[in-house]
Amino acid sequence: MRTIAVLTSGGDAPGMNAAIRAVVRTGLEKGLKVMGIQRGYNGLINGEIFEMDTHSVSDIIQRGGTILRTARCEEFRTEQGREKAAKILKAFGIDGLVVIGGDGSFHGAQLLSKLGINTVGLPGTIDNDLAYTDYTIGFDTSINTVLDAINKLRDTSTSHERVSVVEVMGRNCGDIALYTGVAGGAESIIIPEKEYNADKLCKQILQGKLKGKMHNLVLLAEGVGGANELAKYIEEVTGIETRSTILGHIQRGGSPTCMDRILASRMAYKAVELLISGKSSRVVGIKNGEIIDMDIDEALAVERSFDQELYDIATILSK
C-alpha cells in the first residue's frame, strides 16, 4: 500500500472534514501518499484528483460541509462508468480508497472493490440510518442544530399559545425526530417507524390544553411528511392556532460537535489502518463505544432495530 485516496459522496454531513483531515494525516504519518478526489464519484470519473498534505487539511476540523465537495453521479451507476472510475484510480497509482457517505456511497465502494480496488467506507450521514453502527458522522451535530431550533420555536409557541409542527430530516429513519423530541420535550413525535392517527393527535392536543398546556410541539420526520397539511388540519379540528416549520438543509450545516469530530477522527484512523493491513470492502462503525469494522455486504444487510424503549420514554414524558 503506497497511495490512498479519499472522497465524500451523497449528502454532506458535519464531521466529514474531520474525517478527511484524519485520513490525510494518518496516511502521511504511515508513510503513504494521500490523494483527494473532488465531487465524489463524479469527480473520480472526471479525474478531479490531487495530492494532499498536512496543509491541505489545516483549519478544517471545525468546519461543516466537505472541502472535497460532493455530487451525485449518474454515470457511475453504469458498468461502463464504474470501469472508467477503476481505470482512473489505477492510472493515478491509487491502491486504496476511503469513501465517506451513506448507503448509496457504500454500494459504490462495494462495486469498486469487485473491480480490484481496495475500499473502506465511513458512515457520513445526518440521518443515522445505517443499521450496522450505533451512530453516523454528522448525526450528533444535526440533532443539536434541531434542538436549538425547536427551543426557539417553543419560546414563540408559548407566547402565542399555539401548536408548532416541525418537520425534520429522516426519510426512512426517524432518529432525528425521536432524539430531539425527547431532548426538546415534544408533546408528539411522528416517525416512519410508527403509525399515527391525525384525529388521535388532535384529541391529545385538546386534552393537553384542558390540562393547562400553553403550547404543543409536534415533531414530524420527512419520511412521513406533510407538515403544512398537518398543521392546517390540526387548526381546523382543534381551533387552536397552528404553525408549521420545515427546517430543511440547515440540519446539514454548521460546525461539528465535539462528538462528531472525535467519532470522525477515530473512524478515519481505523480506515487507514484497514487499508494498510490489506483489507478491502469494509466499513467502519461504532458499537457500544468501540470502533468496529465489517464487510460492506454484511453491513448493508443488517436490519435496523427501532429503539422502542426511547420511544416509550418519549411517550410517557410528553404527557
UniProtKB/Swiss-Prot annotation:
GO terms for biological process: canonical glycolysis; fructose 1,6-bisphosphate metabolic process; fructose 6-phosphate metabolic process. It comes from the Bacteria. GO terms for molecular function: 6-phosphofructokinase activity; AMP binding; ATP binding; fructose-6-phosphate binding; identical protein binding; metal ion binding; monosaccharide binding. InterPro entries: ATP_PFK (IPR022953), ATP_PFK_prok-type (IPR012003), PFKA_ATP_prok (IPR012828), Phosphofructokinase_CS (IPR015912), Phosphofructokinase_dom (IPR000023), PKF_sf (IPR035966). It is found in: Cytoplasm. Substrate binds at T125, I126, D127, R162, M169, G170, R171, E222, R243, H249, I250, Q251, R252. Its main location: cytoplasm. Allosterically activated by ADP and other diphosphonucleosides, and allosterically inhibited by phosphoenolpyruvate. Its EC number is 2.7.1.11. Keywords: Allosteric enzyme, ATP-binding, Cytoplasm, Glycolysis, Kinase, Magnesium, Metal-binding, Nucleotide-binding, Transferase. Its cofactor is Mg(2+). ADP binds at R21, A22, V23, V24, R25, R154, G185, A186, E187, K211, K213, M214, H215. Gene3D superfamilies: 3.40.50.450, Phosphofructokinase domain. Mg(2+) binds at D103. Pathway: Carbohydrate degradation; glycolysis; D-glyceraldehyde 3-phosphate and glycerone phosphate from D-glucose: step 3/4. Catalyzes the phosphorylation of D-fructose 6-phosphate to fructose 1,6-bisphosphate by ATP, the first committing step of glycolysis. PANTHER family: ATP-DEPENDENT 6-PHOSPHOFRUCTOKINASE, PHOSPHOFRUCTOKINASE. NCBIfam families: PFKA_ATP (TIGR02482), PRK03202.1 (NF002872). HAMAP family: Phosphofructokinase_I_B1 (MF_00339). Belongs to the phosphofructokinase type A (PFKA) family. ATP-dependent PFK group I subfamily. Prokaryotic clade 'B1' sub-subfamily. This is ATP-dependent 6-phosphofructokinase. It comes from Clostridium botulinum (strain Loch Maree / Type A3).
